[in-house]
Each structure stands twice: as C-alpha cells, then as structure tokens.
Amino acid sequence: TIINVKCTSPKQCLKPCKDLYGPHAGEKCMNGKCKCYKV
C-alpha cells in the first residue's frame, strides 16, 4: 500500500507503516512516498 507520507529513506516509513499494519509491517521508500506491506 502506498501511503501519503513523504520519505527519503525507508526508516521514515517505519512508524506510519507500523501504525497501519502493526509490528510486523514492512516498509519501502518508492518515488518519495512510503510503501507499506504486511510481512
């Protein structure tokens, strides 16, 4: 899921992705936006 959070590194997506999917969330930074996925 691409969420509307700007990023330059995946670490910036860690908290919003965990808020979305819980402790087992995965995160990537793609095209300046966070992408979250369930692991």
From Swiss-Prot:
It is found in: Secreted. Keywords: Disulfide bond, Ion channel impairing toxin, Neurotoxin, Potassium channel impairing toxin, Secreted, Toxin, Voltage-gated potassium channel impairing toxin. Expressed by the venom gland. It comes from Centruroides bonito. The record marks Y37 as: Aromatic residue of the functional dyad. Belongs to the short scorpion toxin superfamily. Potassium channel inhibitor family. Alpha-KTx 02 subfamily. The lineage of its organism: Eukaryota, Metazoa, Ecdysozoa, Arthropoda, Chelicerata. Its main location: secreted. The record marks K28 as: Basic residue of the functional dyad. This is Potassium channel toxin alpha-KTx 2.22.
